[in-house]
Structures are given as structure tokens and as C-alpha cells.
Amino acid sequence: MRILICYEESYRAYSDVLERAIGALRPEADVAACSLAEMGEQLESFNPHLVVSSRPNTVDPGARAAWYKLSPEPDEPSEACLGGRRWRTLNPPLEELLSFIDEVETLVRDGRELGGC
């Protein structure tokens, strides 16, 4: 499974920590990070199953299997989207993101065609 992490340059350290943590805790995943400015190019070349970003999908709406808008600010809501289903959460712990990754991986491994995010 491919996971792309995209944040503003001002949150580069946050992005790098997420990339390392997910890579260590989910070693079977191919994890990459980029800036928001590089997102469009990376979506095309890396073609991730899941995007974790500080922003909602405005680059290719509906074309991704899963998108997790993970706010770097604890008082701002985060939003998860999987197969078109969306839900919001406030200041989610890492375990919640890892559980979401596991759910995405199961659907990808089962070969289901996903979109809507």
C-alpha cells in the first residue's frame, strides 16, 4: 500500500515525523512525504492509495480511495474519507490514524475498486 503525506513547508518537521512513525509502525507500507506545492505531481507519479494531509482533496476530488485530512492544529477538526464515506474527529491520536491505515490496506489487499475521496 502506498501512503503520501503532504503538509505546508512550515509543518515539514510534522510531516517528517509522521512519515517515519508510519513507516516504522507499518513497514509493509510504502510511505513518502512532500510539500503541498508538490502534491499534484506526487499524486500522479506515486499514485497513493491513501493521502494524509493538512488539506482536503482539492487536487483530484473523488479520485482517491482514501484521504485523511489530519489537522496539525489540535483545535481544528480532522476529516477521514474512505470510499466516499466521511467523518470528522478532533485531535485524533496516532492509533486512530493507524487503524484507518489498516482499514484502507484491507480494502486495497482485497482488490476493491475505491474512489470517492
Language model region names:
Residues M1-L36:
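Short, charged N-terminal beta->alpha structural module
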Residues L43-S45, T58-A65, S78-C81:
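Short loop/helix-cap segments at secondary-structure boundaries that form the rim of catalytic
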Residues L36-A37, S53-T58, P72-D75:
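Short, polar loop motifs at secondary-structure junctions
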Residues A66-C117:
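Ser/Thr/Gly-rich flexible loops in soluble cytosolic domains mediating phosphotransfer, phosphorylation
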